Amino acid sequence: MVSEAISKKEIERVKFESKDLHKPDEYWREHLTEEAFYVCRQQGTEAPYSGKLLHNKDTGLYHCTCCQSALFSSENKYDSGCGWPSFDAPINEQVIRFLDDFSHGMVRTEIRCAACDSHLGHVFEDGPKTTGLRFCVNSVSLIFNKK
């Protein structure tokens, strides 16, 4: 659902555009903080309840830390109680890449930025009735741009 705060036209303007942003680790080490490199490039996870965007309630768009591609809208953010920012959907399906993740003895679906392959978090099928999905995203993998 798109409210008046973020118009459908505005979301259409930030639709995924193919970018050649698959850069070597050396590039990312120089341009990211140590924590952002660990999470975004090495598929790490920030500690639960530690992210600066967890309790953000401002209106705007959430962009990829690595390439600034728009990924999520505040309209789709909700408090899942899991300790990480949660969304019921991305701004559109093309901005997210889905990968099977069998690490840590679990079966999960990893989510990555489709433009630069940055690790964002995971998606689970225990979300709200709107979509049934919970996109559980590390705060450090996102930059928030207030409307």
Swiss-Prot record:
Domain MsrB: 25-147
SUPFAM superfamilies: Mss4-like
Superkingdom assignment: Bacteria
Cofactor comment: Binds 1 zinc ion per subunit. The zinc ion is important for the structural integrity of the protein.
Keywords from the named record: Metal-binding, Oxidoreductase, Zinc
PROSITE patterns: MSRB
One GO-annotated biological process of the protein: response to oxidative stress
Gene3D superfamilies, A to Z: Peptide methionine sulfoxide reductase
Reaction it catalyzes: L-methionyl-[protein] + [thioredoxin]-disulfide + H2O = L-methionyl-(R)-S-oxide-[protein] + [thioredoxin]-dithiol
Cofactor or coenzyme needed: Zn(2+)
Cellular component GO terms held in the UniProt record: cytoplasm
Active site as annotated: 136
Pfam families given in the database record: SelR
Class of the enzyme per the UniProt entry, highest EC level: oxidoreductase
Any one GO molecular function term: zinc ion binding
InterPro entries named among the record's database cross-references: Met_Sox_Rdtase_MsrB (IPR028427), Met_Sox_Rdtase_MsrB_dom (IPR002579), Mss4-like_sf (IPR011057)
Protein name from the UniProt record: Peptide methionine sulfoxide reductase MsrB
